[in-house]
Amino acid sequence: MAKEVDSIHLLSCAIEASLGNDFPAFAFRLPGEDGFYWGACEPDRLMTLADGVFPERQEGFFFAPFEEGELPRYFFPVKIQRAEEISLEALNYEAGQTLANLEIKPVDSSFEQYEKQVNTLVAAMSRKEIKKAVLSRTVTLNRPVVSDGQLFFRLAAKYDSAFVSWVNVPGVGQWIGATPETLLDCDGVSLTTMALAGTRKAGAKEPWGQKEQEEQQIVTDYISKVFRDKGLEPIIGERFSRKAGQVEHLCTPISLKVGSANGRLAEILSALHPTPAVGGYPKELAMEWIRRVESHERRYYGGYLGPM
């Protein structure tokens, strides 16, 4: 228990130091794990990567926007530390540091505007112009009295099976989230992704409805086709219910043998993202509708991120 408390304290202080001293940093908790991880670098070491470029054999942390070409793709070329290994002295941490200010002017949609956008997409689906589109909405709130670190740990406690993350890119902003969807995971033997779709209250006893099963099958078929179009044969696992806080989703694991994908990680990621779970289907048509209907830029919301 003492070790866990120490790691939480150290990581909270490190997050505060990143914000106060305005240097790039990230923190995360892997799905189903208890430990926390951290990494940081000097601003001039933060790498901006061109589209299609991916550091396959370099340790660090990757942070990409929802739509390629719209915003920079960042890579933190650092050794990832466990939270209990953090040195606050090395981060020039001082308690009560003043946070660096970043002025953000979001464009919020009223509920009426959002409802109109939903109806526009539903009409397009009714005309069979697209099969699925995922709409997002921005809501600006007063900053909570809790710190970034406190919010990060609350998310980790609430969503134990999610990838929980916090990222600070000076001049760009801070991003915090908890996602149940793994875009790509490599264990040295296989590459694994998941088809995640269909939502209901967690713990429901009745069988999944036809609508949710069809929605999930769209994602499974999409990912399988992406792999086969690249000449890769997917291994499709058994469908199961995956809990995410107060809800659960249908999930099908899909994997590849690592050898068949050597040197093609950037190509595979680019083809997979955005999946129907965050964008829609067919991919390009759904993206066109999202650009047309939404009144804001998603920026890094719905993008992908994670350790290398």
Where do the language-model regions lie?
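Short, Gly/Pro- and small/polar-rich lid/capping loops
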Residues: M1-T48
